[in-house]
Regions:
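Short, intrinsically disordered, charge-balanced linker/junction segments flanking boundaries
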Residues: 109-114
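N-terminal pre-domain/capping segments
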Residues: 1-107
Length: 114
């Protein structure tokens, strides 16, 4: 069994590499990569990085600290009744989050419907 936690608070506050160090020192075996805020203009997951740069940073730190990503969380809510503008926007972010999850080796991604 692996002990895993979400990256939601630590990565935005400390950055990827320092965050990985914190998680490793705390005793975690794996991580759930949080992409919650890709559903708004607060895209703290990507920051100023492009998809490839983000994936490379995640993989480098994952290898450095021997902390794999066992799963990921997609942006949510993934659908809002009656809000087609949001739904079109978040649909593209859902596809992006699934792509990123696959590239970092997460075997599953959690998608909350609403």
């Amino acid at each position: 069994m692996r002990i895993s936690t979400q990256t939601d608070i630590i990565f935005p506050a400390f950055g990827i590499d320092e965050g990985m160090k914190i998680f490793k020192e705390a005793g975690f075996d794996a991580l759930d990569f949080s992409m919650f805020y890709m559903n708004s203009s607060r895209e703290s997951v990507l920051g100023n990085m492009g998809e490839d740069e983000l994936v490379n940073k995640l993989l480098e730190s994952s290898e450095k600290y021997s902390l794999p990503f066992n799963q990921a969380h997609a942006p949510f809510p993934s659908y809002r009744f009656g809000d087609e503008e949001y739904n079109k926007f978040v649909y593209e972010k859902l596809k992006l989050s699934i792509r990123i999850a696959g590239k970092i080796g997460a075997s599953q991604i959690i998608v909350h419907p609403t």
